[in-house]
Amino acid sequence: MGSGWVPWVVALLVNLTRLDSSMTQGTDSPEDFVIQAKADCYFTNGTEKVQFVVRFIFNLEEYVRFDSDVGMFVALTKLGQPDAEQWNSRLDLLERSRQAVDGVCRHNYRLGAPFTVGRKVQPEVTVYPERTPLLHQHNLLHCSVTGFYPGDIKIKWFLNGQEERAGVMSTGPIRNGDWTFQTVVMLEMTPELGHVYTCLVDHSSLLSPVSVEWRAQSEYSWRKMLSGIAAFLLGLIFLLVGIVIQLRAQKGYVRTQMSGNEVSRAVLLPQSC
């Protein structure tokens, strides 16, 4: 809250804690009670329209409210009528409350905007099929978009340059808990040879939309790619095994040399005697 606003709210609360006749309505004062003041700023289209509201609550019941749209204190219960009348009679208090729209709400908005409403994080986009893709067989293509902020985002699917609207499903934006979002947009497909699927992502953090392609390949191409991956992994395993064997062989050679020296000494000693 802005400077100059907190003191008068505190003063009002101190005044309320007296629980005078206007609050107790002639009854005995309760032993335990809670008085609260809650202030809220409501923004529409940035700071184009701002509403400042202060709620005064006695034992969980709101009884007096200041609304900048109304411009005065309003009693919500009989308990609040004397206080509303008293506060509305103080022109300095009314003026300070009305000025809070600029002095509190718009002021704090400018301070917090760079790391709240102005914060932007670019998304990471990945496209992958749900199952091993085979031509002419139904499958589901996933467009995974992660780590973006704010949550408003547009994601579209294209097949050979034409937008696909049918068979599109989305999880919607999901909060990650770290001020970022993630979402997955899925497309039902039956891939044909030569088909090019494109996931187009448009977000306020991007200078231009990001597109990621996925191309349908023949079963032979997939088998060839998988065979290449398997051959690479197998070669890597053989390489590691060879390195381990070589290291062990070098250690064995050193031990053999030491054993040979010991044997030589054992043979020479009797001859010297």
Swiss-Prot record:
Name of encoding gene: HLA-DOB
PROSITE patterns per the UniProt record, alphabetical: IG_LIKE (PS50835), IG_MHC (PS00290)
Localization annotation: Endosome membrane; Lysosome membrane
Residue ranges occupied by any Ig-like C1-type domain in the UniProt entry: 123-213
SUPFAM superfamilies: Immunoglobulin (SSF48726), MHC antigen-recognition domain (SSF54452)
InterPro entries: Ig-like_dom, Ig-like_dom_sf, Ig-like_fold, Ig/MHC_CS, Ig_C1-set, MHC/Immunoglobulin, MHC_I/II-like_Ag-recog, MHC_II_a/b_N
Its biological purpose: Important modulator in the HLA class II restricted antigen presentation pathway by interaction with the HLA-DM molecule in B-cells. Modifies peptide exchange activity of HLA-DM.
Name of the protein in question: HLA class II histocompatibility antigen, DO beta chain
Region span, Beta-1: 27-120
Extracellular side: 27-224
Outcome, altering R18Q: In allele DOB*01:02
